[in-house]
Amino acid sequence: DTSTNIQFGAGGAGTFSDGKLTTRINDPLIMYVLDMLHQLGAPDDIMYKAKPHIGTDILRKVVENADKEITRLGGEIRYKSKAENITSSSVTVNGERIPCGAVILACGHSARDTYSELIGAGFSVEAKPFSVGVRAEHLQSDIDTAMYGAHAGDSQLGHAEYQLSWRQGDRGCYTFCMCPGGEVVPSASEEGGVVTNGMSRHARDGKNANAAVCVSVKPEDYGNNPLSAIEFQRNLEKRAFLAGGEDYYAPMQTLGDLISGKSGTEYKRIVPSYRGGKVRCADFSKLFPPFVMEMLRAGLVNFGKKIKGYDAPDVPLTGVETRTSSPVRIIRGENL
């Protein structure tokens, strides 16, 4: 469904994620946000943990409670309603023109039709750097052992997390949205495309750990044009759909095959969690441009030096990961 999926709907893409509540900014409103989420049903521990997280299972109820609270306060939520003809003073929703004092667009990183409309209407939209890659899955017990050693499995520690990065020249390879005890989920929002993302439940008690392993893409890689940025993502997603068999299975390649330039090795020890293992062997070098493959290979080898076993040859890599951030930037005025 192109209008209701993991990218669009109640809570947006964040509903199906690890539910991390972290930010790099230091703002007094952070505690206000945490307190509000707590009042709406988030667990008590988000108020005191250094790295709080909610988890998709609980977050779905939190979003439901938020909807009810917005309605109670006089707000109106219209689902399955497309916003068009957007100006600074009005918007058309399902054919109804709604005048307003201000329009706030919070459309996330995947509203490609909205981006295209804004560009066509003359709004200032520019191409920006983003990232593409794959989802790497390891046994959570292997990550725990590599990170905690003899203390792996201690309930007071919880499952181990990681965040890895490596640079070569002006390009980087890094892990993103690491989900301890989580699963890889299908996140396409257009027909004929395959996209991966990761999510965890609050308990983080799944067998696998997963994280996106992504390579930075610069505007000059795709023509420094906002529409070209969207098309770069879309082409990768279409190639993934074809490589997966055109039935929304995801393409998968083992880490060992990716490093050595081979393909066809089936998964064994680690079962990919994407739709319960609905993956097919593929050759990612036929999906990604050479600069992405070069950085993925080098980055994964480097990560194996930081976490023992990270670059194990039987690690399944599922793709494609294209929605880590928006490929375009809508320019704000000086008053914002």
Task: Give, region by region, the residue ranges found by the protein language model.
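Residues forming the flavin
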Residues: 1-16, 20-336
